[in-house]
């Protein structure tokens, strides 16, 4: 145990350049690379981020395109957003454009279904 304490003390006293040199020497002697564990750690860190994205509860509904039935899409947009006819038409004409934000998943899916039934292309973000 005393030997480990000595090694720890010696390693702690190394400069950054000396530590980098030591790493290179050990890599050559043992035939390993210090880069491999870093790549594994990075891949492991990406997994929780993917889980967080999968657990998303609020969505933004983005109207991507009106499709062939523009009048039907305008009517549905008007009903969903509560906008006037002119504002709803403007929103549809300016697609792709966010239509509604902070919408719960069930409501977002329902709205997406209505818009797609009218002929629109919609994305949930």
Swiss-Prot record:
* Biological process according to GO: translation
Q: Which cysteines are joined by disulfide bonds?
A: none
Keywords on this record? Ribonucleoprotein, Ribosomal protein
Q: What does this protein do?
A: Forms part of the ribosomal stalk which helps the ribosome interact with GTP-bound translation factors. Is thus essential for accurate translation.
Check the record and name the HAMAP family matching this protein: Ribosomal_bL12
Q: Which family does it belong to?
A: Belongs to the bacterial ribosomal protein bL12 family.
**What protein name does the entry list?**
Large ribosomal subunit protein bL12
Q: Which organism is it from?
A: Rickettsia felis (strain ATCC VR-1525 / URRWXCal2) (Rickettsia azadi)
């Amino acid at each position: 145990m005393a030997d480990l304490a000595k090694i720890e003390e010696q390693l702690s006293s190394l400069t950054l350049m000396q530590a980098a040199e030591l790493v290179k020497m050990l890599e050559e002697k043992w035939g390993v690379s210090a880069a491999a564990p870093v790549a594994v750690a990075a891949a492991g860190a990406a997994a929780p981020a993917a889980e967080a994205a999968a657990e998303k509860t609020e969505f933004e509904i983005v109207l991507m395109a009106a499709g062939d039935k523009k009048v039907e899409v305008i009517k549905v947009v008007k009903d969903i957003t509560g906008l006037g006819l002119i504002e709803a038409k403007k929103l549809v004409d300016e697609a792709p454009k966010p239509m509604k934000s902070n919408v719960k998943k069930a409501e977002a899916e329902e709205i997406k279904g209505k818009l797609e039934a009218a002929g629109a292309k919609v994305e949930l973000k």
